Amino acid sequence: MAWIRTVAYENATGDLRKLYDRIKGPDNNVDNIMMLHSLRPHSMVAHMSIYKHVLHHSNNTVPKWFLEVLGVWVSTLNSCGYCVDHHFGGLKRLLGDNSKADAIKAGIDKRDIVSLPLTNKEKLAIRYAEVLTRTPEKTTKTLIDDMRSAGFSD
């Protein structure tokens, strides 16, 4: 629930209604994170653009499902339950394997990277995301070299 005023789908008009129509789900549901932009629809356009280009662009080399894993992980580190739920929904949809998705979520909930049903390369990316999220000043050349050696590129 937002602490600022938002405009619900049924009360939206003009450009906001057009934007809502592009992103609404079943029963005209608009995600809360998007409704936060309802007083400034131009910021919703920017939000959608950056999200699409960062997580869902066709030129990305990291699989979309794994980008959602990173989203769940970073959201957990940031204690953002709403974001965890959002990224976990995307993970389940993109992965298409609810058992594996649930196992990933269980490991993340315990903050147990070792137990995650992921490759060593993916676990390295999880560790890298943690450093960037919690202590970016502790990023080292060794960590970057390890990422490159594992197959990640700039």
Where are these regions (language model features)?
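Acidic interhelical loop/turn segments
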Residues: 138-154
